[in-house]
């Protein structure tokens, strides 16, 4: 596959090359996937500049992979690869996900709305600082971004084909204290009304 800047526009960051492993050109590759063995099935991988990397041999080691790339035949060549990020294009990914699984690249750019259908903004990114996935949203009103937990409580509905996802503002922490108190008071009032019946 020939490098094309246009084709790599929709790239997906899958792994990063780490330390050399042995003296014959193998490297440890940290894979950002639950199934590191799939890395080879994607075919050609690319770096930030579009240089292609072809996997000749891949062995899984814990949640990472020991990889031998075509043309990398000694430790010195392997050392030169340390820190290179590896990407595939979105169309190289296999679409065999479960109903509640998504590729992050498919969610970026989706419209974000609350449970009443009011537009809040757009998904602009994902982060994980160790405590779980966070969804970055560029808000319409504040022209700023916020991070919310990417959980079923905060994001109860995702509809990729229709181009939107639903965010529950209370669970997502998007309300200020005044708005939060109003919602809590409304909930308490509703509960009181039900108790009277």
From Swiss-Prot:
The keyword Ribosomal protein does not apply. The gene is rimM. Binds ribosomal protein uS19. It is found in: Cytoplasm. Keywords: Chaperone, Cytoplasm, Ribosome biogenesis, rRNA processing. GO terms for biological process: ribosomal small subunit biogenesis; rRNA processing. It comes from the Bacteria. The keyword Mitochondrion does not apply. An accessory protein needed during the final step in the assembly of 30S ribosomal subunit, possibly for assembly of the head region. Essential for efficient processing of 16S rRNA. May be needed both before and after RbfA during the maturation of 16S rRNA. It has affinity for free ribosomal 30S subunits but not for 70S ribosomes. The lineage of its organism: Bacteria, Pseudomonadati, Pseudomonadota, Alphaproteobacteria, Hyphomicrobiales. Residues 99-174 form the PRC barrel domain. Belongs to the RimM family. GO terms for cellular component: cytoplasm; ribosome. The PRC barrel domain binds ribosomal protein uS19. One of its GO terms (molecular function) is ribosome binding. This is Ribosome maturation factor RimM.
